[in-house]
Amino acid sequence: MFIGHFGLGFAAKRAAPGVSLAILFLAAQFADTLWPFLVAAGVEQVRIDPGHTAVTPLDFVSYPWSHSLLMLAVWGVLLGWMFRTVDRRAFAVIAALVLSHWVLDVVTHIPDMPLYPGGPRVGLGLWRSMPLTAAVELPLYFAGVWIYARATRGRGTKGRLGFASLWIGLLLLHVVNLAGPPPPSITAIWAGGIVGFAAIMAWSWWADRYRTAI
């Protein structure tokens, strides 16, 4: 899952209005933000296998430290503790968002999501069908966008256009990821992931800066 995680990040603004959208996105996508660094370091492995599933050409060979249920619970507690003073609900919301990544990925992934490092792997395999994946992910994303729009108000043109450009831009990025060719190399995967997520975090911070919680 990709864009559905951002949907939860958007929606979480209602529960923790004092937390920047960038931090909520970081929490919801913490697993995928950490993963490219671990791939670059050789700690986790991925293989390019066109046709591996209908949705992605990537075969996630091993990612126990970024994507296992146990480790995401640990990362969630640590990240929530780091931002606990930002908002009275920050700890609980951020920790839950980090852990939610595993729950959502289990729905879409084939059985490659570890329960703990070295443990059994699970997955319901929705990625075997592009239409079914879209039927789950897109409503989740649009619901999150709608909740964020109702929970905040734009301050001037920047507030309105920043938010619009963010949610439309993420949607277009999702479409490009699905329709585009497989990545040319493992290096392209982790480098693109690092740069891409950094850009999204900066973009979401800027857009949210001109919104007021209501």
Can you annotate each of these PLM segments?
Residues 1-214:
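N-terminal membrane-targeting hydrophobic helices
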